[in-house]
Structure formats: C-alpha cells, structure tokens
C-alpha cells in the first residue's frame, strides 16, 4: 500500500525512464565508436546494418551491468520509503523486526555496505531492523508485538 500512496509506480517509471534514455544514448555512442574502430574488419556497413544487432546487445548489456547499482538503489530507496510508511501506518516496529528476522532465513541480514549497494534491490534486514528500532525509539507510545497479538490469540 505504501508504494501506491507514495506514488512509487510513477516515480519509478520516471527514474527508470531516465536510465533507459541514457542507455539508448550510450548505445548510440557505443555502436558508432565500435563501427568507426572495427566496422571495416567486421564488415558492418553502418548502424542500420542488421549485423550490428549482436554489438547492440553487448553494449546494452554492458551498460545495464554497470548501472545495476544505480537501478538497485532506485528500487531500494523506494522500498525503504514504503517500509517507513508501513511503520507509520501499523505502528508495530517489533512486528516489522520479527518479519525481517524471518526473511533472514533465506536472505543475508547483514551485508557489507558495498555488497548492499551493488547487489541488493531491497534494504537489508539489518537496515530494516535498525530503522524499525529507531522508529520505535522516536515513538514510545507505539504498541509492542505482544500487546497487539495477545487479544487476537487469547483463549475465550
């Protein structure tokens, strides 16, 4: 729900759209550079020659490989904003921390900063738990997970 309320679908389209426009500019530059340098050797006559397609795939792939940390950061930032929205809506930081610990069974909880920057498209468990505990420290009136769960699971 946080993604919807925070308009992440539109922000994401714009931000990734900018990356794609830059990708096509890089593709144009990369193909022209390669054709000037190796076009005769490869017997590729120009950018309109169908033989340029493998080169286009390679240039595009290299661009997005290098841009992976940027695209992951775009996604990770929106995920963190949605997490904060969820904490403000539910006001259950202990529940958030418990869920993040459960997610740690199949996902690394405490990556290094470089590892998180390059490979993680969502905040790490450590980042999410730390944010939940900071939120809890700033909102002492919030309910703990036990207080919320007791009425639901109490025997009658």
PLM features per residue range, with description:
Residues 1-4, 154-156:
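Short, strongly hydrophobic alpha-helical membrane anchors
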Residues 67, 71-77, 81-156:
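Active-site-proximal gating segments in proteases and membrane effectors
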């Amino acid at each position: 729900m946080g993604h919807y309320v925070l308009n992440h679908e539109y922000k994401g389209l714009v931000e990734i759209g900018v990356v794609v426009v830059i990708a096509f500019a890089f593709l144009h530059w990369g193909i022209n550079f390669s054709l000037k340098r190796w076009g005769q050797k490869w017997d590729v006559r120009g950018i309109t020659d169908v033989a340029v397609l493998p080169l286009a795939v390679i240039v595009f792939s290299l661009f997005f490989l290098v841009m992976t940390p940027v695209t992951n950061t775009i996604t990770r930032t929106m995920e963190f904003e949605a997490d904060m929205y969820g904490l403000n809506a539910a006001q259950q930081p202990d529940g958030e921390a418990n869920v993040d610990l459960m997610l740690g069974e199949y996902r690394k909880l405490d990556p290094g900063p470089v590892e998180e920057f390059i490979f993680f498209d969502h905040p790490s468990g450590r980042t999410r738990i730390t944010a939940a505990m900071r939120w809890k420290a700033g909102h002492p009136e919030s309910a703990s997970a036990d207080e919320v769960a007791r009425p639901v699971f109490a025997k009658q």
